[in-house]
Amino acid sequence: MPFSELYFNVDNGYLEGLVRGFKAGILSQADYLNLVQCETLEDLKLHLQSTDYGSFLANEASPLTVSVIDDKLKEKMVVEFRHMRNQSYEPLASFMDFITYSYMIDNVILLITGTLHQRAISELVPKCHPLGSFEQMEAVNIAQTPAELYNAILVDTPLAAFFQDCISEQDLDEMNIEIIRNTLYKAYLEAFYKFCTTLGGTTADTMCPILEFEADRRAFIITINSFGTELSKEDRAKLFPHCGKLYPEGLAQLARADDYEQVKAVAEYYPEYKLLFEGAGSNPGDKTLEDRFFEHEVKLNKLAFLNQFHFSVFYAYVKLKEQECRNIVWIAECIAQRHRAKIDNYIPIF
């Protein structure tokens, strides 16, 4: 056993045990079979009471809405996460902070986009993910250019380090906002990857494949979404994270791709990605590429729990819980809209 793992439990043993206990409460296939049989959201609430969610909706007045369920699911996850973060020592504390940065990026982009469409900031802030909240959020609406956004708001946040390649005097419009989102994510993933390799050991062995997949998924999606837009091939290539399995040859091929078939051809060279593209289709009843990516992400995150004495379980738990929230909200939406034909289109976890 490596020396560092010998002392792992001194600082982190309690929290690793705690996160494994939380993971044991993730809904099983039997729970989902019960949920999809519910006729109303009140039935859904009753079924969730028999799981680890318990009475988390007990204080909500009828009629229950999907947005309330969504908010409460996030709230429960955030309470668990913050409880662990507040008791963590370095370097686990920094690792857990890294987990929150992706939500901070999403929140900044949501606020800028909403402001661009003349939405009040007071209306937008409640829509932000609580795991990515930060003090300066409500001032985002004063920024007119990426440079202002950085200098006035983000310079004192952890996102400042990821923003160096985004600073320009161009006005914030739809295209620029998407470029900022993807540039921030590229810098974030590369920094997180570097941090995990620095930690080394089992954390690096289990986290790096997860982050490599996340980087490659973004490269595939950026390429597919860029078709038919004004984004040039050169600008598109600048948005690809360089910490995935596709780097460098696969990314060079994606940069030259002109249509979906050419993207699929790139995936052919990578066995795990080839399977994902082959299993996706656009016909009724087929799984979308996004669903296939989510399924693969769940699989990678579950693998993290097979090893002990490492930090990846904290990341994996948050991502599995996030997928569980998406599943419950999907089922709730289908029940609320009486659209049961697609109610089984959730991503099972265990």
Swiss-Prot record:
Keywords per UniProt: Cilium biogenesis/degradation, Hydrogen ion transport, Ion transport, Lysosome, Membrane, Transport
Superkingdom of the source species: Eukaryota
UniProt-listed GO biological process terms: apical protein localization; cellular response to increased oxygen levels; cilium assembly; eye pigment granule organization; heart looping; intracellular iron ion homeostasis; left/right axis specification; melanosome organization
Localisation per UniProt entry: Membrane; Lysosome membrane
Keyword Ion transport applies: yes
Gene3D superfamilies: ATP synthase (C/AC39) subunit, domain 3, V-type ATP synthase subunit C domain
Keyword check for Ion transport: yes
Membrane topology per record: Peripheral membrane protein
Entry's Gene Ontology molecular function annotations: proton-transporting ATPase activity, rotational mechanism
Listed InterPro entries: ATPase_csu/dsu_sf, ATPase_V0-cplx_csu/dsu, ATPase_V0-cplx_dsu, V-type_ATPase_csu/dsu, V-type_ATPase_csu/dsu_dom_3
A cellular component term, taken from the record's GO annotations: early endosome
Family: Belongs to the V-ATPase V0D/AC39 subunit family.
Function: Subunit of the V0 complex of vacuolar(H+)-ATPase (V-ATPase), a multisubunit enzyme composed of a peripheral complex (V1) that hydrolyzes ATP and a membrane integral complex (V0) that translocates protons. V-ATPase is responsible for acidifying and maintaining the pH of intracellular compartments and in some cell types, is targeted to the plasma membrane, where it is responsible for acidifying the extracellular environment. May play a role in coupling of proton transport and ATP hydrolysis.
PANTHER family xrefs: VACUOLAR ATP SYNTHASE SUBUNIT AC39 (PTHR11028)
The protein's assembly and partners: V-ATPase is a heteromultimeric enzyme made up of two complexes: the ATP-hydrolytic V1 complex and the proton translocation V0 complex. The V1 complex consists of three catalytic AB heterodimers that form a heterohexamer, three peripheral stalks each consisting of EG heterodimers, one central rotor including subunits D and F, and the regulatory subunits C and H. The proton translocation complex V0 consists of the proton transport subunit a, a ring of proteolipid subunits c9c'', rotary subunit d, subunits e and f, and the accessory subunits ATP6AP1/Ac45 and ATP6AP2/PRR.
The protein's name in its UniProt record: V-type proton ATPase subunit d 1
Protein species of origin: Danio rerio (Zebrafish)
